[in-house]
Amino acid sequence: MKKLLTTTASVLAGLTISFNLLAGSNVQLDRANTDIRDQKSLQNGAQLFMDYCSGCHSISFMRYNRIAEDLFLDDIVEAYKQAKTNLLTNKPLSATDFQALSNAVDNSVKNIKQAKESLGKLSDSQIEKNLSKATDRMVEKNLVFNADKVGSPIISSMPKKGAEAWFGTTPPDLSLVARSKGTDWIYTYLRSFYKDDSRPFGVNNKVLTNVSMPDVLWHLKESKSTKDFNQDVRDITNFLDYVGEPAKLVRVDLGYKVLGFLFILFILSYLLKKEYWRDVKYGKWKAKD
Ligand code: HEC
């Protein structure tokens, strides 16, 4: 039995070591410390991904309008609620408020009277629809750089043949990269390019040796403090983590609610237990034997 255990242990250890070697974990990975609930970080990550990565990489499992709904809709709804409160309490309306009200009625709103009239004609569900439409429009304007529509999957427009000629390989689809490589890997990889004149693009990478991707973030790195640059890379990594599993947003949120429920249930059960045991303690209750 003992021998069997030792053999199993050494086989497992051997496997772990070889998997680690395969995964190239001889490089110390930095902790990404991303937080999928941080919506500002995800928004910045989405913008940076579209600006710096989408020219080469697709994330074909993701559609633009899903990003709109998951990452930007909340802000648009929030702005509308604020504008509506200001409108109903007769506070002065800012340009942002007018924009938010225009979003809600799906028409350009120019004055208070018009805002009140237009809103009065719409049901809540119509307003919801309009706000979602406005979010799609915003995403189409800021994140879609090619002729794609907001309902399309996010596909890079780089021709496959060209990519192979330029890089020796096609840039991989990044839909699931956070799940296959992990966030720490991506975070470290993007910050590990170094100058190497023997390589076609003049750079190499500590995590992915002889990499065929250029250091696309070098300009960003030079124009910012290290702290801000690291935050930008963290945001891109966070965004890729979200792309790998969009349902995580719902799951994490649900997890907190379940824990909250269990906590309340714990208090109630404890009080109930005390109530039952009080009778036992004071001898009012005796088991029938
Ligand atoms: C100019 C084209 C180009 C751009 C722009 C680009 N990449 Fe790449 N990327 C590549 C190529 C080519 C590879 C394959 C590298 C290799 O295997 O040697 C790659 C590989 C990767 C990998 C490794 C994937 C894997 O599974 O091995 C990740 C992660 C990655 N890129 C992320 C990014 C991110 C994030 C951005 C934007 C900040 C970006 N890339 C911008 C061309 C590009």
Where are these regions (language model features)?
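Electrostatic cytochrome c docking/interface patches
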Residues: 24-47, 58-69, 244, 248-253
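Conserved nucleotide-binding/hydrolysis modules and their immediate coupling elements
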Residues: 197
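Gly/Gly-Pro-rich "capping" loops immediately C-terminal to redox-active cysteine motifs
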Residues: 35-36, 61-182, 187-191, 200-225
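Bacterial N-terminal signal peptides that target proteins for export
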Residues: 1-12
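Juxtamembrane interface at the cytosolic side of transmembrane helices
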Residues: 251-255, 262-289
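The canonical Cys-X-X-Cys-His
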Residues: 49-60, 236
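Extended, hydrophilic extramembrane loops/domains of integral membrane proteins
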Residues: 207, 212-245, 249
